[in-house]
């Protein structure tokens, strides 16, 4: 991985409680190129992001390193949704010349150790787009709340019916993209909200990107459970995907 320029992309909305811990944990695992997109937060998320960015700059100056190992804080003045924040992050990673980009949730539910799992198939030149699946991990699937099991499997099937690749965990926030996939998705993604995960799979199939899945684990806490998708969001994703299919992009 040493010769690959890898960027982590973290969409964040009102994540003042977790964002510093999440970024520091990634840095402790030697993932230092991190793009955080604040999606119009109303708390201190962006303030903390700027502090992390400044710390990164100071570390670079102390090590005479002006190019890499950096935290980049980007702010949306108005909330655009997780899809909008993801698109901003993907475009920035592509602009910076990333060989691989990885999306990573801001609520602490992902384990940094799993990043290597989603990256490896791309490094091996076998895949262009890799989804980290909680459902392919038998232990994780057993521990997953029933509503999440039904919702994830249902949305994965709906995504397939609407023209996307079938993957077991279509709503996973931990995904890796090669440079070619990064270019395609940064140019073609339109979805602004949670339906962005499904739209990415539809675009990937349309462009014949080579896709794969790897099992990952999930760190379930009261905090992450409260911030994930629920039944109502699942219905909204379905509706918004139908609108996309008809050529209508909803805010």
Curated annotation (Swiss-Prot):
Its EC number is 2.4.1.153. Keywords: Cell membrane, Glycosyltransferase, Membrane, Transferase, Transmembrane, Transmembrane helix. GO terms for biological process: N-glycan processing; protein N-linked glycosylation; S-layer organization. Pathway: Cell surface structure biogenesis; S-layer biogenesis; Protein modification; protein glycosylation. PANTHER family: DOLICHYL-PHOSPHATE BETA-GLUCOSYLTRANSFERASE (PTHR10859:SF91), GLYCOSYL TRANSFERASE (PTHR10859). The chain crosses the membrane at residues 150-167. One of its GO terms (molecular function) is dolichyl-phosphate alpha-N-acetylglucosaminyltransferase activity. This is UDP-N-acetylglucosamine--dolichyl-phosphate N-acetylglucosaminyltransferase. Gene3D superfamilies: Spore Coat Polysaccharide Biosynthesis Protein SpsA, Chain A. One of its GO terms (cellular component) is plasma membrane. It is an enzyme of class 2 (transferase). It comes from the Archaea. SUPFAM superfamilies: Nucleotide-diphospho-sugar transferases. Belongs to the glycosyltransferase 2 family. It comes from Methanococcus voltae. It is a single-pass membrane protein. Disruption phenotype: Cells lacking this gene result in flagellins and S-layer proteins with significantly reduced apparent molecular masses, loss of flagellar assembly and absence of glycan attachment. It is found in: Cell membrane. Pfam families: Glycos_transf_2. Involved in the assembly of an N-linked disaccharide that decorates the S-layer glycoprotein and flagellins. AglK initiates N-linked glycosylation through the formation of alpha-linked dolichyl monophosphate N-acetylglucosamine. It catalyzes the transfer of GlcNAc from the donor substrate UDP-GlcNAc to dolichyl phosphate C55 (Dol-P) to yield Dol-P-GlcNAc. AglK reaction proceeds with retention of stereochemistry. The reaction is specific for UDP-GlcNAc. AglK shows a stronger preference for short dolichol (C55-60 Dol-P) substrates compared with the longer (C85-105 Dol-P). It catalyses: a di-trans,poly-cis-dolichyl phosphate + UDP-N-acetyl-alpha-D-glucosamine = an N-acetyl-alpha-D-glucosaminyl-phospho-di-trans,poly-cis-dolichol + UDP.
